[in-house]
Regions:
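Phosphate/diphosphate ligand-binding glycine-rich loop within oxidoreductases
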Residues: 1-96, 203, 211
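Glycine-rich adenosine-cofactor-binding loop
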Residues: 82-85, 92-96, 100-120, 132-133
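Short, conserved loop/helix-junction motifs that constitute active-site signature segments
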Residues: 97-99, 120-124, 183-193
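Conserved S-adenosyl-L-methionine
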Residues: 121-127, 215-218
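NAD(P)-binding Rossmann-fold cofactor-contacting core
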Residues: 124-148
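Rossmann-like adenosine-cofactor binding region
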Residues: 146-220
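Adenosine-phosphate binding glycine-rich loop
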Residues: 199-262
Length: 262
């Protein structure tokens, strides 16, 4: 709620954004009982796939990933969007890390799928490496990346790929990489050459991202992704378009960053 409500204040909108608990498989019923005052929703797991199934229209990112994290009321029903892709793209672009020839994605869940689509937008000629423990999900993610025109393959160790990649995107939740981070500590001479985006942001820097910051390399917090995917949602809620910037968007971003930092 902090990001949205901060932005509403800057934009002068008399809107409110609040957290609502909806049970698994209960999203359609919840939406059907709403009055017209409700303009849109952010959707978190495990409801993203349910949202994808019942919306009346979807943006390309939602179609590709099979997941909807944003619902917006329209004249013809509910539109579904995936703004996680935009969040990753903008977080990386604003970090200005240079060319992306090789990108390593850690994980194989919904966020990893969004990361693959984001890589295609950032650098369609990039080679994508996938590291994940679930062999079936890892193979499915590699196949998905290839199906949308990327070069992709699995890797079975982090040491060399993580050092050489221009960008490492960890899509795992906080704490999931603690064991791997400990291994990196034991690998004498581990010196990453590129940047890292860790979607886990509490605490920050994460133990995983610290290996990059200690080497003087760019580290991108999951808060940056969170902020930019929310900016896309705000664009959708205000004028139904994720691509057109908000009025005074620079001031909105500055206010949101200040709120998150404090």
């Amino acid at each position: 709620p902090l990001i949205h409500n901060t932005a509403y204040g800057v934009l002068g909108l008399d809107w409110s954004y609040e957290k609502i608990e909806v049970p698994r498989a209960g999203l359609r019923k919840f939406i059907s009982e709403l009055d017209a005052d409700w303009a849109g929703f952010s959707v978190t797991m495990p409801l993203k796939e349910e949202a994808f199934r019942f919306v009346d229209s979807k943006n390309e990112a939602a179609e590709l990933t099979g997941a909807v994290n944003t619902l917006a009321r329209t004249e013809t029903g509910w539109a579904g969007y995936n703004t996680d892709v935009f969040g990753i793209v903008q977080a990386v672009r604003t970090a200005a890390i240079g060319s992306l020839d090789t990108v390593l994605i850690v994980g194989s869940g919904a966020t990893a799928t969004s990361a693959v689509v984001a890589v295609r937008e950032l650098s369609p000629d990039a080679k994508v490496l996938v590291f994940a423990r679930n062999a079936q999900a890892r193979a499915a993610l590699v196949n998905f990346a290839c199906s949308i025109g990327l070069q992709a393959r699995s890797v079975y160790s982090l040491k060399s790929p993580a050092q050489r990649a221009d960008l490492v995107i960890s899509t795992l939740p906080g704490g999931a990489l603690d064991e791997i981070s400990a291994k990196l500590n034991r690998w004498f001479g581990f010196k990453p050459q590129g940047a890292v985006l860790d979607v886990a942001y509490s605490p920050w820097p994460s133990a995983f991202a610290t290996h990059w910051s200690d080497a003087g390399k760019p580290t991108i917090s999951g808060l940056d992704m969170l902020m930019w995917q929310a900016i896309a949602q705000l664009r959708i809620f205000t004028h139904g378009d994720a691509e057109t910037p908000l009025p005074n968007e620079v001031a909105v971003v500055e206010a949101v960053r200040h709120a998150l930092d404090n």
